[in-house]
């Protein structure tokens, strides 16, 4: 997958760590906003398609594309990486304001640094424009499969981080892409200079020289990193 580090952690080189979306979003409650609601006639709705438990936000509709109902989307991690799920998944869930809809996508493809797609039932530019501003979710189960040493950000956020001595370093609160590799933003309980509790932060590069194991079943990442770094 483009943009990944290569190699194998067991050989002391940087493993190929995959990236995807920013972080999990609220999956069960819809909060109203001032941006309006998706036009009920804009996309074909299947009442049986309820909001999935493993829905992950992967992008947003930013504009119409052409005159035949296509939409242009911004993928949260860039079309070459975050766009992979937008290209593969044919079932999308859209949220605009407080309203949620299901859309079956008939076609999707890369277009420059964006993704363009055609939701079934979107017949013209006006219909597509009605979807502008909608957040796009897909099922986690519809993400493309990764190699054994690749990971999606959404699966890493929330994992505990410990060093090789077993010292707890905190929990992954977010992932950052610095253009070269991913970085774990690890939060941990700390005490401020005034003696009050605060949230401390560690930034640990997600590369093989520091990351020694990702144990998803155990809910943790093992790193070569000291607590006083």
UniProtKB/Swiss-Prot annotation:
- A single GO BP: ribosomal small subunit biogenesis
Q: What's any one GO cellular component for it?
A: ribosome
Question: Which cellular compartments is it found in?
Answer: Cytoplasm
Question: What disulfide bonds does the UniProt entry report for this chain?
Answer: none
Does the UniProt entry include the keyword rRNA processing?
yes
One Gene Ontology molecular-function label: ribosome binding
Sequence segments annotated as region (Disordered):
1-37
Domain called PRC barrel: residue spans: 148-229
Could you confirm whether the keyword Repressor appears in this record?
Answer: no
Recite the UniProt keywords alphabetically. Answer: Chaperone, Cytoplasm, Ribosome biogenesis, rRNA processing
Which Pfam families does this entry report, sorted A to Z?
PRC_RimM (PF24986), RimM (PF01782)
What is said about its interaction partners and assembly?
A: Binds ribosomal protein uS19.
Q: Which family does it belong to?
A: Belongs to the RimM family.
Q: What is known of its domains?
A: The PRC barrel domain binds ribosomal protein uS19.
Q: What role is this protein assigned?
A: An accessory protein needed during the final step in the assembly of 30S ribosomal subunit, possibly for assembly of the head region. Essential for efficient processing of 16S rRNA. May be needed both before and after RbfA during the maturation of 16S rRNA. It has affinity for free ribosomal 30S subunits but not for 70S ribosomes.
Stated name of the protein: Ribosome maturation factor RimM
Q: Which organism is it from?
A: Burkholderia pseudomallei (strain 668)
